[in-house]
Structure formats: structure tokens, C-alpha cells
């Protein structure tokens, strides 16, 4: 599951615009029993090996989330006796794609990882740790959800259940690869602790479909865009994980294709006015969350030679065009007004963060936040109410496996 469904708390800005290298070595290995929302861990890693404090997980609107759903309703949706719209032949084709396991031998590390990590220093090192932490947490949350769906649907619809199980395999592989990467920075996430300690956010099945489809597709466009950029600009290739993004993004794409098939099998989620409203809502939620988070991490994108806002808008536009093939309505993200409002939200969010960093008592902070939250809500509503693009159709050609680049 891509990071956009489980984004994290904004971090402090840094002025670094390119990788900083040194020959320093880093000390003790630390197991971290927390999410990436804790800055103390990352700072300890950046400084080189002080044991990080085991702080509590802090929940915000932009914090990584683990999801659960109504599994009984899921079973009813995929019961072939109840739902005659299920296209089992399409699911069978998708199952064969997942069974092929194109990336079975792809995620193999080499000595480049540790050597590159030892050369990354200062603010960029801190940001790489946060990138790995939040990405690992997001992939692991997808693993848990898909694994449980695979288990619960085994009797109701074995084909769909097996696809979910194979997707959990992919997510576990991604999370493990990222967590191993943290060892290059002398850290590791305690995923077992995360499983027990995290709060789970409940989403109805149809919301899981909307949000996860967008998450997987936006993940594809993020990964392939970074991969293409670094292939053309190898001087910014400061850590080898990016070399794996070309194949990695195809896992995200296949997962998105599966959720597209799930939506087509439930036309009630696509063919009425409520579906149009929810489609626009989830597009807005995913796009805004990504934009706000990334604009608080410009040092990461600048460190690999990208302009953060240009990168995000490219990803949003491409994701929106892909999403328009299945969602009944999408946002008009290519309207200049859309980006203008995103940038305004970034300004408001920065003011909110600044309030949180003051030494004022909690009551005063909350009073200062009220007008800012109202302004942010106003911008969100105005963006949501922009004239949408009518789109989508459930009249698709038969599924044909293909790579998309």
C-alpha cells in the first residue's frame, strides 16, 4: 500500500538542497518501537547512534494509519451467490498475474546500501530515515489489512481471497525491504510492537475500495516518476533503493488494477450521485494530504534533484487521469485554481505548525488554531466544490495484463 494512505506528521524544514556526504561511521544499532511520527528517533539516527527514547505514538490528521473494516459486509459483497455482478474470469486473470510474482527475486540487497548510507550526513540523513520509517509503516499497514481480508474471504470467494493474500505478500516484502534499509542507518522498526500498539481506523468496505485504489495508483506514479528522474539525472542517485522503484511500482499498479476490478464488481459504488461525491472526496483527501506532507519535506525532494511542488502536481495530474477511467467523477486538478488553493493550504498548515512550536500554554495555542483551522476548512470546501470532471465507466474491455510506464 502506498504511502499516501498512511502519511505522517510534518517535520521541520531544512535548507539542504543537495546530498551532504562524509566518511563518518555510525554507532550502535537501535530497535525503534514507535512510528515515524516521533522526531526524537530520527534525530538520534542523524546524530549517529544515541539510543532513541521510546516515545508514544502521536496521532494527527496526517499520521500513518492502520485500517480495519466490516469483514462481514466484505464477505457478503464477494459472495458469488449474492452478488451476480462478480466477474470471476477477470479475477482469475488477475490471480494468475499475482501468482507469476514478477518481483520474487527483485528485492535483493547489495553492499551499495550500507556504503551509501554511511556517506549521507546531516539533515538529509535524518530525512532518509523518516522516509524509510513512514514508508515501512505504510506498507506494513497494507500487509495487515490484506492478510486479514485474505483470511476472512477464503470460504466466501477463494479467488479474491488468494489475491488479497498475494498482495499481503507484496506488502510484507516491501515493508521488510524498507526495514532492512533502516539497518543501514542503525535502526529498525519493531513491526510486532506496531501491530499491537497502533490505533486502527475503521472504514466501510466501499471507502476502503476508493482510498486504497487511489493509494496504490498514486504510489505507482510517485515511484515511476522518481525512478525516471534519477535515471536521467544519476548525479542525484545518492541511495540505491531508488534503483528498485521501476519494478516496485508495478506491484502498486497491479494492486490498483485489482481494486479497479473490485469497484466494477460493485456498480452501486460507481453509478449514483453519492458515488460521485465520495469519489471527489477521496481524491481531495489523498491529493491534499500528499501535497501538505511533501511541502514539509522539501529537503528530501530537493536532495534528489526534484522540485517538490512540480513533482507533486505531476503525480496528482497523472493519478487523476488514471482514476478518471473508473471513478464516476474526479477533481479538475489541471485547473490553475486547484494548485492555487493547494498552495494556500500549505501556507495555513505552516502557520498551524508554527503555533504548535510556540511556548504558549495549550489554551492559548488552541485559541490561535481556531481561525487557522477554519481557514483551512474553507479552502478544502472551496476546492471540493470546484466544478468536477464527469468521468468513469463500468463498461470496460476484458482484462488484459500489461505493464504501464
UniProtKB/Swiss-Prot annotation:
InterPro entries in the record: AcsF, Ferritin-like_SF, Rr_diiron-bd_dom
Organism of origin: Gossypium hirsutum
Entry-linked NCBIfam families: AcsF (TIGR02029), PRK13654.1 (NF010172)
One Gene Ontology cellular component: chloroplast thylakoid membrane
Keywords: Chlorophyll biosynthesis, Chloroplast, Iron, Metal-binding, NADP, Oxidoreductase, Photosynthesis, Plastid, Transit peptide
Enzyme nomenclature, EC number: 1.14.13.81
Catalytic reaction equation(s): Mg-protoporphyrin IX 13-monomethyl ester + 3 NADPH + 3 O2 + 2 H(+) = 3,8-divinyl protochlorophyllide a + 3 NADP(+) + 5 H2O
Function: Catalyzes the formation of the isocyclic ring in chlorophyll biosynthesis. Mediates the cyclase reaction, which results in the formation of divinylprotochlorophyllide (Pchlide) characteristic of all chlorophylls from magnesium-protoporphyrin IX 13-monomethyl ester (MgPMME).
Main localization, broad class: plastid
Single Gene Ontology MF annotation: metal ion binding
Family: Belongs to the AcsF family.
Protein name as catalogued: Magnesium-protoporphyrin IX monomethyl ester [oxidative] cyclase, chloroplastic
Annotated transit peptide: 1-43
GO biological process, one term: chlorophyll biosynthetic process
Amino acid at each position: 500500500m502506498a504511502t499516501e494512505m498512511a502519511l505522517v506528521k510534518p517535520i521541520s524544514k531544512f535548507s539542504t538542497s543537495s546530498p551532504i556526504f562524509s566518511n563518518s561511521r555510525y554507532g550502535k544499532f537501535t530497535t525503534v518501537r514507535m512510528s515515524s511520527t516521533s522526531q526524537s528517533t530520527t534525530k538520534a539516527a542523524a546524530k549517529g547512534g544515541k539510543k532513541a527514547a521510546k516515545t508514544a505514538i502521536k496521532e494527527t490528521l496526517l499520521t500513518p494509519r492502520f485500517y480495519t473494516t466490516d469483514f462481514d459486509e466484505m464477505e457478503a459483497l464477494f459472495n458469488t451467490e449474492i452478488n451476480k455482478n462478480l466477474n470471476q474470469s477477470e479475477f482469475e486473470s488477475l490471480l494468475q498475474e499475482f501468482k507469476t510474482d514478477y518481483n520474487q527475486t527483485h528485492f535483493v540487497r547489495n553492499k551499495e546500501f550500507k556504503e551509501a548510507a554511511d556517506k549521507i550526513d546531516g539533515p538529509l540523513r535524518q530525512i532518509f530515515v523518516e522516509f524509510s520509517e513512514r514508508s515501512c509503516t505504510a506498507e506494513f499497514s497494507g500487509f495487515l489489512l490484506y492478510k486479514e481480508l485474505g483470511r476472512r474471504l477464503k470460504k466466501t470467494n477463494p479467488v479474491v481471497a488468494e489475491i488479497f493474500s498475494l498482495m499481503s505478500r507484496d506488502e510484507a516484502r516491501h515493508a521488510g525491504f524498507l526495514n532492512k534499509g533502516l539497518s543501514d542507518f542503525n535502526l529498525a522498526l519493531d513491526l510486532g510492537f506496531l501491530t499491537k500498539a497502533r490505533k486502527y481506523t475503521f472504514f466501510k468496505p466501499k471507502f476502503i475500495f476508493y482510498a486504497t485504489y487511489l493509494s496504490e495508483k498514486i504510489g505507482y506514479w510517485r515511484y515511476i516518476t522518481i525512478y525516471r528522474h534519477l535515471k536521467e539525472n544519476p548525479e542525484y542517485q545518492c541511495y540505491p533503493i531508488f534503483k528498485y522503484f521501476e519494478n516496485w511500482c508495478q506491484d502498486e499498479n497491479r494492486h490498483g488494477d485489482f481494486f479497479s476490478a473490485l469497484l466494477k464488481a460493485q456498480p452501486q459504488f460507481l453509478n449514483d450521485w453519492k458515488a460521485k461525491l465520495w469519489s471527489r472526496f477521496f481524491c481531495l483527501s489523498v491529493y491534499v494530504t500528499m501535497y501538505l506532507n511533501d511541502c514539509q519535506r522539501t529537503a528530501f525532494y530537493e536532495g534528489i534533484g526534484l522540485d517538490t511542488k512540480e513533482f507533486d502536481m505531476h503525480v496528482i495530474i497523472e493519478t487523476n487521469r488514471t482514476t478518471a477511467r473508473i471513478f464516476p467523477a474526479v477533481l479538475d486538478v489541471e485547473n490553475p485554481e486547484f494548485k492555487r488553493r493547494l498552495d494556500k493550504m500549505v501556507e495555513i498548515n505552516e502557520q498551524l505548525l508554527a503555533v504548535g512550536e510556540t511556548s504558549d500554554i495549550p489554551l492559548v495555542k488552541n485559541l490561535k488554531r481556531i481561525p487557522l483551522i477554519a481557514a483551512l476548512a474553507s479552502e478544502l470546501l472551496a476546492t471540493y466544490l470546484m466544478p468536477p470532471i464527469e468521468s468513469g465507466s463500468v463498461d470496460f474491455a476484458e482484462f488484459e495484463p500489461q505493464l504501464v510506464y
